[in-house]
């Protein structure tokens, strides 16, 4: 048995790739997991539901605001210090063989605590542009896994540690009850604009079938009036629908792009302009460069442009599915280092 401590939360973009790694590790060896979740965030809820066998510890911590000299950061820094002491207590008790981290402020806290205790650290960065936690932790990590080759440019000092793997995706045996539809993901953070945009598109494309993840019951009711739209408040598991989709419309979060590329679904990407350090724009441009998508800037998105782009991506057809889930390569690398 190996004992793994893990953190990567606050958002689904950090959480789901981490779960993909842990689930793949568990298929290869007997694993006991200590999971550090952010109190009140998605990781706390999802991990307790999907993996009751994990020991889940909720940590009350928030990331630093930008700019870093923001006056509220004084209090947040104090809370980070308190959280680090708490995390160290749990790590000393659990005695993990390694720590797996996928970014977000909770990763910074757990990673620095693990560094002080001499526990091997493995990091994965989902975005093209690495976040602050990954930049800091890369100097202490045994391996730094990245989704894109271009991420090397942002971590020049740690080239010998970097392994380009792609972004892990959670596997599922389930399949959607529909097929040959355009998958619209409008329910995540900052995506109200996609819901509003698609409401104007649907009447113009009545021959095209859509599945739309809305993010709220109100939007589900509102979009269900269109006969060509299957509106769902939340989709779980996402893979069941990616398998059957012929195209997609979404923001450009790393895990969304990872699923799009893994299942070979061409997409229209509308980057969220407010994402940290323009992460979503950089992700979208890289996916477009690799031939997976069309990027439409939010201030340029119109019903007419979406309709024209849907026609292009549907005509493009599905791309060959990835032969191997990046989670497999990451698991092999980790086990090769510690066993």
UniProtKB/Swiss-Prot annotation:
Membrane topology, from the record: Peripheral membrane protein
Catalyzed reactions per annotation: di-trans,octa-cis-undecaprenyl diphospho-N-acetyl-alpha-D-muramoyl-L-alanyl-D-glutamyl-meso-2,6-diaminopimeloyl-D-alanyl-D-alanine + UDP-N-acetyl-alpha-D-glucosamine = di-trans,octa-cis-undecaprenyl diphospho-[N-acetyl-alpha-D-glucosaminyl-(1->4)]-N-acetyl-alpha-D-muramoyl-L-alanyl-D-glutamyl-meso-2,6-diaminopimeloyl-D-alanyl-D-alanine + UDP + H(+)
EC identifiers of the protein: 2.4.1.227
Alphabetical keyword list: Cell cycle, Cell division, Cell inner membrane, Cell membrane, Cell shape, Cell wall biogenesis/degradation, Glycosyltransferase, Membrane, Peptidoglycan synthesis, Transferase
Primary site of residence: membrane
Highest taxon in the source lineage: Bacteria
InterPro entries: GlcNAc_MurG (IPR006009), Glyco_trans_28_C (IPR007235), GlycoTrans_28_N (IPR004276)
GO biological process: carbohydrate metabolic process; cell division; cell wall organization; lipid glycosylation; peptidoglycan biosynthetic process; regulation of cell shape
EC class: transferase
Cellular component, GO annotation: plasma membrane
Binding, UDP-N-acetyl-alpha-D-glucosamine: 11-13, 127, 170, 188, 235, 280
Residues spanning the signal sequence: none
Keyword Aminoacyl-tRNA synthetase: no
Single GO MF annotation: undecaprenyldiphospho-muramoylpentapeptide beta-N-acetylglucosaminyltransferase activity
Biological or metabolic pathway of the protein: Cell wall biogenesis; peptidoglycan biosynthesis
Subcellular location: Cell inner membrane
Protein family membership: Belongs to the glycosyltransferase 28 family. MurG subfamily.
NCBIfam families the record matches: murG
Function text: Cell wall formation. Catalyzes the transfer of a GlcNAc subunit on undecaprenyl-pyrophosphoryl-MurNAc-pentapeptide (lipid intermediate I) to form undecaprenyl-pyrophosphoryl-MurNAc-(pentapeptide)GlcNAc (lipid intermediate II).
Database matches in HAMAP family: MurG
Protein name: UDP-N-acetylglucosamine--N-acetylmuramyl-(pentapeptide) pyrophosphoryl-undecaprenol N-acetylglucosamine transferase
GN (gene name): murG
